[in-house]
Amino acid sequence: MPVEAKAPDPLIGFSFGSRYQTDYNFRGVSQSNRQGSYQSFFEAQYFGGFAYTGLATYQTRLPTQPDMEFDLAAGIRPTFDKFALDLGVLYYFYPNEKRLLGPGGAFLTTANTDFMEYAAKGTWTATDSLTLGLNVFYSPNFLGQHANGTYTSGTAAYTLPANWFSFLPEAYSGGFSISSELGYYFLTAAKTSATGQIAFNLPSYLYGNVGLSYTYKNIVLDVRYHNTNLSKTDCFNFTGDYRGFNNGGTSKWCGDAVIGSITFQTSTAAPGIYAEPGGLLNLFR
C-alpha cells in the first residue's frame, strides 16, 4: 500500500483559547486587585508560523477603571535548528479609562495608560525536556507616563519524567513540567498630569516566578508563586493603587502571590481534545 502523503501546512493557521487566573499578575504586579481574571486570546499564523498577528483580552481592576486590557500583537518567529526567535511589537489598550480624582478635583492618576512595547525573545531547546529562554521588552512610553521601560528576563522550563507519576493511569502520567522566570524591570523618570508634569522616578525592581504545570491535550493547569523586591510604598508609587491614598501610601499588589490558572487552547495545527468525539467530556471518562 503506498504511503499516504502528508497534507501541506495551511498558509494561514489559527490558535485561540481562554484562561481563568485567580489573580492577573503582570511581571509581579496584580492587575486585578488580587481577584480572579477571565482572559481570551486569538492568533493567526502565516507562512508556516513564520509571521503572526494576535489579540488578547484581560479582565482588570485598575485605578483608572478601564473596561478591560485589550492587547494587539504582530511579529515574526524565525527558527534555526534548536534556537527560535520571536521578534514583535505589542500595543496595550485600556478602553474607557477614567481619571481618578482626589479632594478638590486633584488629579491622582493619568487619563490614558495605553502604551506600545517592542519584544525580542529567544528560546533554546537544550534537550527534549529542557528549554531555556532570554527575553527583552522595551517601551518608550511606559503606561503613557513618558518613561522608558525595559524588562529583561531569563526563563527555564523542564518536562518531568512520566515515570515519576507512575501511580497515575498511563494516559495522565505525562504532561507535568516545572518552569521559572527571573527578570528585572528598568524604569526611568515619569512625567504625568497627576504630578503637574514634574518628573518623578519610577522604582525599578526585581521579579521572579516558579511554578508547576500539567498539560492534558489542550488543557493546561498551572500553580505559580510570584514575588518582587518592591516595598509596599514603592508598590503604591508604581501602581497608583487607589487604596494607598487612604492608608498612608502603600499597596499589596506587588508582594508574594500564589496564583492558579486553567487554560483551554486549540489551533488548526493541533485541534486535540476539541476534535474528538465527546469533546471535553473525555476528561471525565
Where are the model-predicted features located?
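Outer-membrane beta-barrel biogenesis signature
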Residues: 1-15, 26-31, 158-173, 269-285
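Outer-membrane beta-barrel "beta-signal"
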Residues: 154-160, 214-216, 250-285
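Short glycine/proline- and aromatic-enriched beta-strand/turn motifs that initiate or cap beta-hairpins
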Residues: 4-61, 267, 285
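Repeated loop/turn-to-beta-strand initiation elements of outer-membrane beta-barrel proteins
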Residues: 48-53, 82-87, 128-134, 162-168, ...
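Transmembrane beta-strands of outer-membrane beta-barrel pores
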Residues: 20-26, 46-48, 55-61, 78-80, ...
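Outer-membrane beta-barrel translocator domains and adjoining extracellular loop/strand segments
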Residues: 26-33, 63-70, 97-109, 143-149, ...
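Membrane-embedded beta-strand positions of outer-membrane beta-barrel proteins
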Residues: 16-18, 42, 51-55, 74, ...
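Residues that define the transmembrane beta-barrel architecture of outer-membrane proteins
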Residues: 10-12, 34-38, 66-70, 83, ...
